[in-house]
Every structure is written in C-alpha cells, then in structure tokens.
Amino acid sequence: MSFPNSSPAANTFLVDSLISACRSDSFYSSSASMYMPPPSADMGTYGMQTCGLLPSLAKREVNHQNMGMNVHPYIPQVDSWTDPNRSCRIEQPVTQQVPTCSFTTNIKEESNCCMYSDKRNKLISAEVPSYQRLVPESCPVENPEVPVPGYFRLSQTYATGKTQEYNNSPEGSSTVMLQLNPRAAAKPQLSAAQLQMEKKMNXXANGQEPTKVSQVESPEAKGGLPEERSCLAEVSVSSPEVQEKESKEEIKSDTPTSNWLTAKSGRKKRCPYTKHQTLELEKEFLFNMYLTRERRLEISKSVNLTDRQVKIWFQNRRMKLKKMSRENRIRELTANLTFS
C-alpha cells in the first residue's frame, strides 16, 4: 500500500483512524473532547468513511455530538444512542432483544415440602417476604422447606423413627427394633426349645447309664465258674478270631475317653492287638528298635502272633517315633521364635 503524498502526519492519521475504527465497537464517547483529526484530500478514500463506523467531519463542522454510529447485532443498546434520520446510518437487520432474567410464577415445582424444617424456623422475619414468590402455593410461608425428588421421601422412610426420637418412648423404639430385626424376636423361642432338648438329652443319658451297668454285670454273672473262665482264656490265646472279639468287648466296656484303643475324637483305633500283645511289643521296642529274624520269631511265639504281624508292628512303631520326634523338634524351634 503506497500513498502519493505520504507524510508522518498522514501515516499517523491512518493508523489512528484504523485503531479508532476497530475500537469503536467496544466503546463510544459522545463528548466533544474526542480526538478527531481533520481528513485531508489525499486520504479521503482511506479515511474513516471507508470503515463504515464513524463518518468523517469537514473542517467547517463543529458539532461532534450529532455523530451517527453503526448498529451491531451483539450490542442492541447502541441503537438508542444513534439518530435514525442521519443519512450516514447503515441499516442492519433487526436483532432480537436479550430477554431479561426474571423468575416466573408458573414454573412447575415440587409440591411436597420435606427436609430442613428445623433450620428454616431460625430465619429472620424480614427475609421471608423477599423469597415469598419462589415458594410454591401448597407450602406455607411460615414453614418453607426444600423440595426433594420423588424417588427419596424422607417423611416416608423415617417418619416413625423421628416421632419416636422426639417423644422419647421406649416402647415405640422396641417395636421399631423388632421390625428392623425380626430374628431377635425368635431368639427367646429358640433358647426355650434348646433348653427342652437339653433336658431330653440328659434324661436319655440317665436312662442309658443303668442299662449299660446291667449289660456289664450280666457277662460276669454268666461266667460264674472259674473253670469256664480259664477255658475261655486258653481259647483266646490259641485263636486270633476270639482275640478280636475280646478286643471289641473291651472297647465297648471302656468309656469314650482317649485310651490306647480309642482316639481322642472317640473313633476306634485300627488296632488288632490286645493289651497284653501291645505291652510285650512295646517292651521289646524300647529294648531294641530293630529285630533280627530269630528274635522276631521268638516274640511272635510268645505273643501268639505271626512273624509278619510283628514285623509290620515294628515298622509302624518306628514311623510313629520318627513323626513324634519331628513334631517335638518343630515345637521346640517355634517356642523360641516370637511371631509379631
């Protein structure tokens, strides 16, 4: 862009005119003190007339207050400042005015009034009329409350609980607790039923004890002759089947406490040996853990067992000793350690 008569004044006027033309959108000054340099003849085509915002003034015109201004769609208030009869006014499409922000009374609001009733009672009486229009008609102004959506109603869920808390009635609270926890009401009935069952078990146990005593006394009464007892002892030593029967009878006669044939849990141990046999085998095991063939045959003849039975018993006893020693060692090691 080149100008025929370019001078510093003309250049400054052009820059000032462009800046003022661009800035005239944001502010407007109707005072006579606004800076407006006179345009020259050379700059007529590049002056403020080309911008379409402010008309250029001649030297003879002094009235700066009647200056016309453009109407922009995003500033509807400027339309009242300008003179519509001016020839320099450029017509713009009519714009819609910005609606004023005002609350209407026909807005659909929640009609149910709920929470915060205690807090709203503390409001100053002077503040209530200013917000009277916002409160729905169904709610009185004296007790305005916050509407709550329909999916959660505080009055429906906690109405009974609030009334009981305010009235301080223990009977009502007990009924509510029974409604909330129905299992607590059934506990006394269950306890009564348990007491009845315990009484029945005790009566049955007392009735079974004399029967056991009679059963234990009856074999002794049957075997009254000493000769028959000696014969039975000889038969038991000779035949292993009779030994198993005797061991079963001993298990029945013993109490269910932990014995050498009964475990602590009450179940029967898998032990086909009698007391006499186990005592003899234990003595030999304490003397020597490993047996030779000759010694094993002698023990089997004395205890009335086969060679294979004595061999298996010693193997099992060694495994048991190994297990017990391992458990004792672990117990000693863990006793010295402190677990945090």
From Swiss-Prot:
Ranges where the record places region Disordered: 206-259
Ranges of Polar residues composition bias in the record: 208-217
GO CC terms of this entry: nucleus
Keyword list, A-Z: Developmental protein, DNA-binding, Homeobox, Nucleus, Phosphoprotein, Transcription, Transcription regulation
Protein purpose: Sequence-specific transcription factor which is part of a developmental regulatory system that provides cells with specific positional identities on the anterior-posterior axis.
PANTHER family per record: HOMEOBOX PROTEIN ABDOMINAL-B, HOMEOBOX PROTEIN HOX-D10
PROSITE patterns: HOMEOBOX_1, HOMEOBOX_2
A molecular-function term among this protein's GO annotations: RNA polymerase II cis-regulatory region sequence-specific DNA binding
Major localisation: nucleus
DNA-binding region, residue intervals: 266-325
Protein name: Homeobox protein Hox-D10
Family: Belongs to the Abd-B homeobox family.
Gene coding for it: HOXD10
Annotated Basic and acidic residues bias: 242-253
Subcellular location: Nucleus
Residues bearing the modification Phosphoserine: 238-239
